[in-house]
């Protein structure tokens, strides 16, 4: 998209507040939304439609870790790329709901009011939104090690009988559109544990030109992940190659 000065300008994708606020009853009752229906509605708001390459690289079984760069910027919430990937999995593997179980952050930075630091309302809200959308909420910042351990044990327990991919943005919220970042601390161990449970990693590179573009690469087998000095860095290297 070109601006008047010939410089490429990023498109803006308005936050789908109607859909987000529609989760309120689930948050209040502790119930869950259809991730298939929710993500389909999010994708329908993306204009122009996103491009997806390399679907043929997805493995025969949906039992894997779906990994991608955290493609978020001003005017583009990470919800949009996550929804596109969720619907791509839905189309490839059929009527799974949830098509993907994403691992999401469980805490926001504290608010600053003058010299004081106040816990963010997101600390209360995010775990409840995560539950409503079948996500695993994991605080990766080290703020609550016991809670992190409980969340990761749940991921690993479910991985043994997973019928759908586990979704992960290894960079976390520090990831910025178009700029590869280091994976979060602990992601290496998580990927290695999941690999030992038999889950390969499926790298996807997200980029943007005239539209959002998703490039699905070759699957990284469990043996390659467990043999790597750092499984998370290996995954991010493959993702970086797909972003070009």
Please provide the spans of the model-predicted regions.
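Membrane-anchoring hydrophobic helices of lipid-metabolizing enzymes
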Residues: 1-100, 104-114, 120-138, 150-153
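Non-catalytic C-terminal accessory region of glycerolipid acyltransferases
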Residues: 2-24, 132, 143-244
């Amino acid at each position: 998209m070109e601006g008047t000065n010939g410089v490429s300008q990023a498109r803006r994708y308005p936050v789908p507040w109607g859909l987000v606020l529609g989760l309120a009853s689930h948050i209040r009752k502790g119930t869950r939304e259809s991730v298939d229906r929710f993500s389909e509605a999010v994708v329908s708001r993306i204009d122009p439609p996103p491009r997806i390459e390399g679907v043929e690289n997805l493995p025969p079984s949906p039992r894997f870790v779906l990994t991608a760069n955290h493609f978020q910027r001003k005017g583009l919430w990470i919800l949009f790329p996550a929804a596109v990937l969720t619907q791509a999995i839905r189309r490839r593997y059929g009527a799974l709901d949830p098509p993907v179980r994403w691992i999401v952050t469980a805490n926001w930075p504290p608010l600053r009011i003058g010299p004081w630091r106040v816990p963010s309302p997101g600390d209360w809200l995010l775990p409840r939104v995560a539950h409503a959308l079948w996500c695993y909420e994991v605080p990766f910042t080290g703020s609550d090690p016991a809670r992190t351990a409980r969340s990761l044990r749940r991921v690993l327990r479910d991985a043994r009988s997973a019928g759908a991919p586990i979704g992960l943005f290894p960079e976390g919220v520090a990831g910025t559109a178009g700029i590869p970042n280091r994976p979060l601390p602990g992601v290496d161990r998580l990927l290695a544990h999941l690999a030992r449970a038999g889950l390969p990693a499926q790298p996807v590179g997200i980029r943007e030109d005239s539209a959002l573009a998703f490039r699905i690469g070759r699957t990284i087998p469990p043996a390659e992940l467990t043999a790597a000095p750092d499984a998370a860095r290996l995954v991010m290297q493959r993702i970086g190659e797909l972003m070009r």
